Amino acid sequence: MEANKIIITGGATRIGASIARKLSGPGVELVIHFNKSKRKAERLKKELLKNKTRVYLVKGDLSKENEVNKILKFAKSKLKYFDCLINNASLFENDKLENFTTDSWGKHLRTNLRTPALLSKEFAKNIKGKNNNIINIIDQRIFKLTPFFFSYTISKTGLYTLTKTSAMSLAPKVRVNGIAPGPTIKNKRQSEKHFKKQFMATPLKRQVNVSEICNAVEFFINNKSITGQVLAIDSGQNLNWQTPDITGGKE
């Protein structure tokens, strides 16, 4: 696999940690960003060191530009140059048009859209060769819009657009693609019952395995003829005409 100088935001837990494991190995250097998950980040680092991966941990609040700049400075000092950026971290809070606040709106847009844009800009300035990749972790809801999770959805549809436009801007040296996951890992708002209801309501009636998302990341890195694409890995959830948030389930 042609990715050895890698930055992963939100890489200490959940999907981000699984991607870090997938991309790790001898000769690989990983900068793993975290915010509140220091212990999990340290455990992951210890795990990855066993397979001869060089791991560098960096803490930062992605809603604050000065902290994003510190992350970039740290990554440059450790890796010297980059060949893969995984914009995985995101803020996911529920609001609607009727009750959103400027604080919630701002945090979602800064964390989920502005920061990936800033990281992408600096990534493109610090590359070598022509096989460089940015992979944005988005959300299947960009293909199946609802009025729920208003600020989050706006930020993720923006990230979808960023994926497309940056693929145009950064070609041919950087390929930019995205993954739009469906029900993969239960979130803090959901009970096991509600999560099962969510994935059983998909056409394929199955939970997305995180390994399938990791395989897609590897596929995008290895396939040099793909850019500007967003792949839904969601058991067909974006095809539903009635989604759990409409029928009374929790997301």
Label the predicted regions:
Residues 12-14:
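Conserved glycine-rich cofactor-binding loop
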Residues 210-233, 238:
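C-terminal substrate-recognition "lid" of short-chain dehydrogenase/reductases
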Residues 28-43:
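Conserved glycine-rich Rossmann-like NAD(P)H-binding loop of the short-chain dehydrogenase/reductase
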Residues 96-97, 104-109, 198:
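Substrate-binding pocket helix/loop in short-chain dehydrogenase/reductase
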Residues 144, 227-251:
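Short C-terminal tail/terminal secondary-structure segment
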Residues 133-171, 183, 237:
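Catalytic loop of short-chain dehydrogenase/reductase
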Residues 88-93, 236:
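Conserved NAD(P)H cofactor-binding loop of Rossmann-fold oxidoreductase domains
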